[in-house]
C-alpha cells in the first residue's frame, strides 16, 4: 500500500513509530508536513502538491493533526479523501472531536455514561449552573484548555462561584462538571483501533493532585479493563465516527464515564507503558480496510 502520514514533525515518537511499523510491513510510506501542502480543488483531477511534487494514488492516510492545526489539517485530509484515499480518521470525525461540547452532546445522545455536565458562556445564574450538576464540589474547565491547564476543582459552592465569575470576566467558554471523587486522581486511557481497545493504561496524578495528566506529573501503569469499560470505549469512538481514538474514562461508582476523546492520541505513553505495538495495530487496521479497490469511504461533508 501507499501510505501518507500527515504530521508536522517526522521526529515525533508517534510519527517515527508509525513510519517504522508501515516499513516493517513493506508499505511505501511518506511523512508529509500537511501545513506545507497546497491543493488543487477541481472535480476532474484533484491533487495535493508537496515540495514541488504531486501527491497521488495514496491508498491510506494517517492524520496526526495537532489541535492548533485543525482547520488546515482537516482540509488536507479531506482533499486526500476526495482523491479516494482511506483515512485512519475522517476529516469530519476529527473536526467533530475537536469541539469538547459537541463531543459530549453526541455521546449523551447515544446514551454513553458521562459526568453530569453544564455549559455556559455568560450566564447570570451561576448558582443555578452549579446546582444543575449536583452542587459543590465541581470541576470547572475552560473549553479551550489542554494538558490539564484550565481544569479547576472547586470544593465549595463559594469557590466554584468565584472561579466561574473569574472565567466569565475573561469571556471564556466553560464546562461545569460533577466531580468524580471516587476516581481518586486517576483516569484510564483506552486506545481504540477499529472496533477494539488494543491497549489501555491507568494514569495517576501526582500526590495531592486530582488531575491525572502526565504533563502535570502523573504516572502511568498497565490496567485490566472490565468488559463494560471496553464496550464503553468502543461505543464512544464509534459514536464520534473515529476509527483511531484515545478514549479517557473515569471509574465512577455507577460505572465508567467518558471524560474526553482524542482523535490523534499519542503513542509514546501507551506503547511504553503496555508494551503493545500500537503503531502496528493501526497499520494492520489500514491493511484490512484500505486495500486497493476497498476504499469505499462515502463521506458526507
Ligand atoms: N469530572 C471530573 N471528575 C474527576 N476528575 C476529573 C474530572 N474532569 C477531569 N478530571 C481530572 O482532570 C484531568 C484533566 O481534565 P481533562 O482531561 O478534561 O482536561 P485536559 O486534560 O486539560 O484536556 P486534554 O486532555 O484535552 O488536554 C483528567 O485527566 C482527570 O484526571
Ligand atoms: Mg485530558
Ligand atoms: Mg482533550
Curated annotation (Swiss-Prot):
Q: How is the cofactor bound?
A: Binds 2 magnesium or manganese ions per subunit.
Q: Extract the PROSITE patterns matched here.
A: ATP_GRASP (PS50975)
**Class in the EC hierarchy, top level:** ligase
Protein name (Swiss-Prot/TrEMBL): Probable alpha-L-glutamate ligase
Q: Which GO terms describe its molecular function?
A: ATP binding; metal ion binding; ribosomal S6-glutamic acid ligase activity
Q: Which HAMAP family match?
A: RimK (MF_01552)
Residues annotated to bind Mg(2+) 1? 248, 260
One GO cellular component term of this record is: cytoplasm
Which sites bind Mg(2+) 2? 260, 262
- What gene is this protein translated from? rimK
* Top-level taxon of origin: Bacteria
Q: Per UniProt, where does Mn(2+) 2 bind? A: 260, 262
Q: Which SUPFAM superfamilies match?
A: Glutathione synthetase ATP-binding domain-like
Q: Where is the ATP-grasp domain?
A: 104-287
Q: In this UniProt entry, which cysteines form S-S bonds? A: none
Amino acid at each position: 500500500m501507499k501510505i501518507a502520514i500527515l504530521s508536522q514533525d517526522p521526529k515525533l515518537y508517534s510519527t517515527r513509530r508509525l513510519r517504522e511499523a508501515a516499513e516493517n510491513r513493506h508499505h511505501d510510506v511518506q511523512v508529509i508536513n500537511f501545513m506545507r501542502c497546497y491543493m488543487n480543488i477541481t472535480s476532474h483531477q484533484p491533487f495535493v502538491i508537496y515540495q514541488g511534487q504531486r501527491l497521488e494514488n495514496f491508498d491510506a492516510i494517517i492524520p496526526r493533526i495537532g489541535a492548533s492545526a485543525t482547520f488546515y489539517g482537516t482540509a488536507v485530509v479531506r482533499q486526500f479523501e476526495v482523491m479516494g484515499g482511506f483515512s485512519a480518521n475522517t476529516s469530519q470525525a476529527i473536526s467533530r472531536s475537536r469541539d469538547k461540547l459537541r463531543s459530549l452532546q453526541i455521546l449523551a445522545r447515544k446514551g454513553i455514561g458521562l459526568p453530569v455536565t453544564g455549559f455556559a458562556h455568560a450566564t447570570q445564574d451561576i448558582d443555578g449552573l452549579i446546582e444543575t450538576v449536583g452542587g459543590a464540589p465541581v470541576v470547572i474547565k475552560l473549553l479551550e484548555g489542554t494538558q490539564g491547564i484550565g481544569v479547576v476543582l472547586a470544593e465549595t459552592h463559594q469557590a466554584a462561584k468565584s472561579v466561574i465569575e473569574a472565567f466569565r470576566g475573561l469571556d471564556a467558554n466553560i464546562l461545569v462538571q460533577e466531580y468524580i471523587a471516587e476516581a481518586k486522581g486517576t483516569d484510564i486511557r483506552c486506545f481504540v483501533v477499529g472496533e477494539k481497545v488494543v491497549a489501555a493504561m491507568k494514569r495517576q496524578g501526582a500526590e495531592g493532585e486530582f488531575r491525572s495528566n502526565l504533563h502535570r506529573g502523573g504516572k502511568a501503569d498497565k490496567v485490566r479493563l472490565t468488559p463494560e469499560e471496553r464496550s464503553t470505549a468502543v461505543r464512544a469512538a464509534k459514536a464520534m465516527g473515529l476509527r483511531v481514538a484515545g478514549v479517557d474514562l473515569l471509574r465512577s461508582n455507577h460505572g465508567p464515564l467518558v471524560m474526553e476523546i482524542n482523535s490523534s492520541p499519542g503513542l509514546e505513553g501507551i506503547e511504553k507503558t503496555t508494551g503493545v505495538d500500537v503503531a502496528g495495530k493501526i497499520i494492520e487496521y489500514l491493511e484490512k480496510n484500505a486495500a486497493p479497490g476497498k476504499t469505499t469511504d462515502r463521506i458526507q461533508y
